[in-house]
């Protein structure tokens, strides 16, 4: 199967590198007690070694990680709906619980192919769920202050607003 998909996998990997050429670094978003959250693009194997845990938002490119690995698969260019954001946040909370239970400093990487959109939307939803932000624009500002090239589109922002209403019990 790997041979069959090799051309696609190579193209997708190269595409992620071309789009992120100007911003290859991961960005530190937030530090909570012994856990620091970073946001970035799909990592190389050597990059994953800098982290004790990784959260993979990429459905189209596999990553081989020896670290604590959690995944919420989503496709590029398909905005996550509010229910999908909720499920992704639940999985991210599992990772954060595992990381915070450790006695040593934990570095956590949340990523998508480019580190611009899918992972950013999930992180914004998590920031609101954990009450680090009370509004969508505040969550986006937290992320963009560390990673200014992040851009969520109108549909993603709308879905984050719906997710926020669900958090408050105002949406079905």
Regions flagged by a language model, labelled:
Residues 116-121:
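Glycine-rich nucleophile elbow surrounding the catalytic serine of serine-hydrolase chemistry
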Residues 1-18:
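Transmembrane alpha-helices and immediately adjacent membrane-cytoplasm interface residues
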